[in-house]
């Protein structure tokens, strides 16, 4: 884990954060459906999904977004998540 201390003013428009990669699996899709209640057939029904333009099940947006956020967890900005914590 890398710790940084970066303030709002330090971020530049267009800056990027490079992370490692991760494959979204069938298990990810099914588990996310169970956690979120998103059981639409194009996510969980393999036979139905074959009839779609994708030809297979597709991950929920919220699943891909969650995984994307998790990939950034290797860089921790102490200012971003503990600001004001000392006053609690």
Question: Can you annotate each of these PLM segments?
Answer:
Residues 1-85:
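Hot-dog-fold acyl-thioester-processing enzymes
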């Amino acid at each position: 884990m890398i710790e940084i201390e970066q303030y709002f003013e330090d971020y530049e428009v267009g800056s990027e954060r490079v992370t490692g990669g991760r494959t979204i699996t069938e298990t990810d899709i099914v588990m996310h459906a169970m956690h979120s209640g998103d059981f639409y057939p194009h996510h969980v029904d393999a036979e139905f999904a074959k009839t779609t333009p994708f030809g297979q099940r597709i991950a929920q947006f919220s699943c891909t977004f969650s995984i994307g956020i998790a990939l950034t967890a290797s860089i921790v900005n102490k200012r971003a998540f503990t600001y004001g914590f000392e006053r609690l």
